[in-house]
Curated annotation (Swiss-Prot):
Keywords: Kinase, Nucleotide-binding, Serine/threonine-protein kinase, Transferase
Top EC class for this record: transferase
GO molecular function annotation: ADP binding; ATP binding; phosphotransferase activity, phosphate group as acceptor; protein serine/threonine kinase activity
Name by which UniProt lists this protein: Putative phosphoenolpyruvate synthase regulatory protein
Amino acid sequence: MSTIRPVFYVSDGTGITAETIGHSLLTQFSGFSFITDRMSFVDDPEKAREACARIQAAGERYQVRPIVVNSCVDQSLSLILADSGALMLDVFAPFIEPLERELASPRLARVGQAHGMVDFDTYHRRINAMNFALTHDDGIAVNYDDADVILVAVSRAGKTPTCIYLALHYGVRAANYPLTDEDLESDRLPPRLRNYRRKLFGLTIDPDRLQQIRQERRPNSRYANLETCKREVAAAEVMFQMERIPTLSTTHTSIEEISSKVLATLGLQRELY
C-alpha cells in the first residue's frame, strides 16, 4: 500500500516553476501517493499565514509531515511558511548565494518575476503560436508556409498536446497532420507535406498503448481495434523510414521530452518561457 504524503507547491507567482521542479523530484520516488496542491500568488504575509494554516491542517489530517516546494522570493514569506513544520524545499536558495558571489551583485527580490509578463513581444509570440497550433490542429488548415514544425502521426499518438506545449512554452508555431487510411496506403509522404520536408517530425507509439487510448475515445470501434492500430503504426513507421523523417516514440516519453527532442532535431533554438 502506498504511503500518503501531502505536497504543496507554494509561489508568489503562478506556481509553475515550483510545480515543475517539484514534480520532477517526486517522480524519483516510488511507493508513495503524493497528494499535491498548488498555492499561487502567495505574495503577502496574510496569504502566507493562510497557506501555513492549510499546510498544518494537512499534516494533522494525514498524520505525516507535509512537503513544501517553495518558490517565494521574499524570505519573510518563506519564514512564515516554515512555521507549518513542513519539510521546506526552497527552489531558489541553493543557487542564489553562489550566483551573488560569482556575479558580485545582490539579487533583485522581485515577487512574481519568474513568470511575469515582462516582454510584450514574447507574450504576443506565444499567443500567436497558440492560435496557430489550434487552427492547424489535425489538418484543419494546411497552410504550412508559416509553420516552424509539422508533427506527423496516426490519430491519438500525441500530436495535439505536443503542439500546444511547444506553442505555450516556446512560442513555436507547430502544426500537426493526421495520417489517414488513404495516406497510409502509400509509403510516400502525402502530397500536401512534400514541400515541407525539413519541417516534418514523425511521432509513433506502441500499438497496445494506442489501442488503450482509442478505446477510451471510441469504445469497441474499428478505430480502436488492436489490429487497426498495429497496421496504422507499422505503415506510418515504414513511411517515416522511407522518407527519412526523424521519428520519436511517445509511448513512454513525456510531452516535455518530446518537445525538447523536436526542437533539437530540427535545430529550432528557442528559450523556455
